[in-house]
Curated annotation (Swiss-Prot):
Protein name: Large ribosomal subunit protein eL39
Organism listed in the record: Thermoplasma acidophilum (strain ATCC 25905 / DSM 1728 / JCM 9062 / NBRC 15155 / AMRC-C165)
GO biological process: translation
GO cellular component: ribonucleoprotein complex; ribosome
Pfam families according to UniProt: Ribosomal_L39
Family named by the database record: Belongs to the eukaryotic ribosomal protein eL39 family.
UniProt xrefs under NCBIfam families: PRK01242.1
GO molecular function: structural constituent of ribosome
Keywords: Ribonucleoprotein, Ribosomal protein
InterPro entries noted in UniProt: Ribosomal_eL39, Ribosomal_eL39_CS, Ribosomal_eL39_dom_sf
Length: 51
């Protein structure tokens, strides 16, 4: 990917980076471990972005 990105694409990439995190521990404790996985998790090599 090119080094110089337009602002809209950069913002969308940052949103995808923020979504690609694990569920926080306090959320697991608050939901009695019912919520343990993030359905939006994505591997950088296997998953593709639709942007």
């Amino acid at each position: 990917m090119s080094r110089n990105k337009e602002l809209g694409r950069k913002i969308r990439l940052m949103k995808k980076i923020k979504q690609n995190r694990r569920v926080p521990g306090w959320v697991m404790m608050r939901t009695a471990r019912k919520v343990t996985q993030n359905p939006l998790r994505r591997n950088w090599r296997r998953g593709s972005l639709k942007i």
